[in-house]
Amino acid sequence: MILGIGTDIVYVPRISNLWKKFGTKFLKRVFSEKEIEDSKKYTNFDAQVRHFAKRFAAKEAYVKAVGTGFGKSIKMPDIIVSNNLHGKPQITINNSNIKYKIELSISDEKDYAIAFVVLYTEL
């Protein structure tokens, strides 16, 4: 049974500008240590920005699917976006005992990154 659906689109230059303006302070406020570490596999700044833009969109799409938004119960770094062994994007929630499954699709093209999240339980 589908419990929630969320989507978000991010203007990639916005993430680039925030990173240039606030540096690692911005990264640590929004992304987990794992996401920051994973970005280091890209030697090109633009590829790193796309990496972060897709993860930003995924976090926004997730809270839209849950219906809570960000706040006291969940912070952006608690939502960890990574890839499984086959390269499929996935979301894990830090310090959470969620009782539903999460499906994530992310993509980027030129100046935009998009994410789509579906929350569901098995019948």
From Swiss-Prot:
Keywords: Cytoplasm, Fatty acid biosynthesis, Fatty acid metabolism, Lipid biosynthesis, Lipid metabolism, Magnesium, Metal-binding, Transferase
Name under which the protein is recorded: Holo-[acyl-carrier-protein] synthase
Subcellular localization(s) per the UniProt record: Cytoplasm
Function field: Transfers the 4'-phosphopantetheine moiety from coenzyme A to a Ser of acyl-carrier-protein.
Cofactor(s) essential for the protein: Mg(2+)
Catalytic activity: apo-[ACP] + CoA = holo-[ACP] + adenosine 3',5'-bisphosphate + H(+)
Enzyme class: transferase
UniProt cross-references to Pfam families, sorted A to Z: ACPS
Lineage start: Bacteria, Pseudomonadati, Pseudomonadota, Alphaproteobacteria, Rickettsiales
Encoding gene, per UniProt annotation: acpS
Main location: cytoplasm
Organism: Ehrlichia chaffeensis (strain ATCC CRL-10679 / Arkansas)
Entry's Gene Ontology BP terms: fatty acid biosynthetic process; lysine biosynthetic process via aminoadipic acid
EC identifiers of the protein: 2.7.8.7
Coiled-coil boundaries: none
